[in-house]
Amino acid sequence: MSAHCQVTGRKPSFGKSVSHSHRRTSRRWNPNVQRRKFYVPSEGRTITLTVSTKGLKVIDRDGIEAVVAQIRARGEKI
């Protein structure tokens, strides 16, 4: 499962870990993504999305129908 939100487009960010002796090593911060199933009434079926926790709040605010329309407008297949 890739760490990529289908709703917000959030991806991992990159940076450095700094130890006590100030040695820097590369690391990445993954977004908190989860696979969730949502029922889409207009299609009469459930869809599975990989969403971040912020994406879940967007779905609660805008509704699953509007979010699915935005994802399809970007060209992603669901």
UniProtKB/Swiss-Prot annotation:
Gene Ontology biological-process annotations: translation
Gene3D superfamilies for the chain: Ribosomal protein L28/L24
Keyword Ribonucleoprotein: yes
An example Gene Ontology molecular-function term: structural constituent of ribosome
InterPro entries found in the cross-reference section: Ribosomal_bL28, Ribosomal_bL28/bL31-like_sf, Ribosomal_bL28_bact-type, Ribosomal_bL28_sf
Region: Disordered, residue numbers: 1-29
The family this protein is said to belong to: Belongs to the bacterial ribosomal protein bL28 family.
Protein name: Large ribosomal subunit protein bL28
Originating gene: rpmB
